[in-house]
């Protein structure tokens, strides 16, 4: 199977084609907000992903947070 070259930004963590040379897809974490019914949850989403050897913490959990500001709350 074809692999993605180092620095390729089309990679998706845990999915899709693997990065070449044993590298992995790593990303920056960005705080995000989503609505679930009437409540809000804050969570971390992965952005600026690319193939390489740097390591970033995987934060996939969303948690209810009423102090979280969604864009439409501004």
From Swiss-Prot:
Q: How is it modified after translation?
A: Contains 6 disulfide bonds.
**Location in or out of the cell:** Secreted
Q: In which tissues is it expressed?
A: Expressed by the venom gland.
Give GO cellular component annotations, separated by semicolons. extracellular region
GO MF entries: calcium channel regulator activity; toxin activity
What keywords appear on the UniProt entry? Answer: Calcium channel impairing toxin, Disulfide bond, Ion channel impairing toxin, Neurotoxin, Secreted, Toxin, Voltage-gated calcium channel impairing toxin
Q: What exactly does this protein do?
A: Potently blocks vertebrate calcium channels Cav1 and Cav2. Is the most active on Cav2.2/CACNA1B (from HEK) (IC(50)=2.3 nM), followed by Cav2.1/CACNA1A (IC(50)=4.3 nM), Cav2.2/CACNA1B (from oocyte) (IC(50)=14.4 nM), Cav1.2/CACNA1C (IC(50)=26.8 nM), and Cav2.3/CACNA1E (IC(50)=96.4 nM).
State the protein's name.
Answer: Omega-filistatoxin-Kh1a
């Amino acid at each position: 199977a074809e692999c993605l070259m180092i620095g390729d930004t089309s990679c998706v963590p845990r999915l899709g084609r693997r990065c070449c040379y044993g590298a992995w897809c790593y990303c920056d974490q960005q705080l995000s907000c989503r609505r679930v019914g009437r409540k809000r949850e804050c969570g971390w989403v992965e952005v600026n992903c690319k193939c390489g050897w740097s390591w970033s913490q995987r934060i996939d959990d969303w948690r209810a947070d009423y102090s979280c500001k969604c864009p439409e709350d501004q």
